[in-house]
Swiss-Prot record:
Molecular function per GO: ATP binding; pantetheine-phosphate adenylyltransferase activity
Record-linked Pfam families: CTP_transf_like
Residues that hold ATP according to the record: T10, F11, H18, G91, L92, R93, E101, Y126, A127, F128, I129, S130, S131, S132
Protein name: Phosphopantetheine adenylyltransferase
Gene responsible for this protein: coaD
Cofactor: Mg(2+)
Domain of life: Bacteria
Any single GO BP term: coenzyme A biosynthetic process
Annotated Gene Ontology cellular component terms: cytoplasm
Catalysed reactions, semicolon-separated: (R)-4'-phosphopantetheine + ATP + H(+) = 3'-dephospho-CoA + diphosphate
Keyword check for Phosphoprotein: no
Positions marked as site (Transition state stabilizer): H18
Primary residence: cytoplasm
Uppermost EC category: transferase
Length: 164
């Protein structure tokens, strides 16, 4: 059956940094499931509803045959078990990401010892991109087309137009 990996996140919205990691992960694993967290932590209320984030991710990732996009509401390790995945993929943009990601990986290992966490770093041109920065630039009327898929840029423009 091959190796199944899960790449979890809020993807609020999905950026070129995410898609870079997903494309590279798709080459490493037989099946890569992009797990969109439907209920992220209360301190991280999403700007886009889960249905919108799923649609934008599917649009941005169209054409990558071994990638699926699915929402999840459970603990990540339960989502991993449900899909019989062996690997969790996480991205590291900078050294500052490492401490938090290391803690998450350690907790996941305590909860499910048979699942490995693999860290990937983005291509240099994407290392500074984050969903929150993209949302902020868009909210202030900036052009985010270099950082996201055209459908995402349009969704952000539409969101800005709705805000009084």
């Amino acid at each position: 059956m091959g190796v199944t990996a899960i790449y979890p996140g809020t993807f609020d919205p999905i950026t070129h940094g995410h898609t870079d990691l997903i494309q590279r992960g798709a080459r490493l694993f037989d099946r890569l499931i992009v797990g969109v967290a439907a209920n992220p932590s209360p301190s991280k209320a999403p700007a886009f509803a889960v249905e919108e984030r799923l649609e934008l991710a599917r649009t941005a990732l169209a054409g990558i045959d071994n990638v699926e996009v699915e929402a999840f509401t459970s603990l990540l390790v339960d989502f991993v078990a449900h899909h019989e995945a062996q690997v969790i993929v996480r991205g590291l943009r900078a050294v500052s990401d490492f401490e938090y990601e290391f803690q998450l990986a350690s907790m996941n290992r305590q909860l499910r010892a048979d699942v490995e966490t693999v860290f990937l770093t983005p291509a240099e041109q994407y290392a500074f991109i984050s969903s929150s920065l993209v949302r902020e630039v868009a909210a202030l009327g900036g052009d985010v087309s270099r950082f996201v898929h055209p459908a995402v840029a349009e969704a952000l423009r539409n969101r800005v137009r709705r805000v009084p």
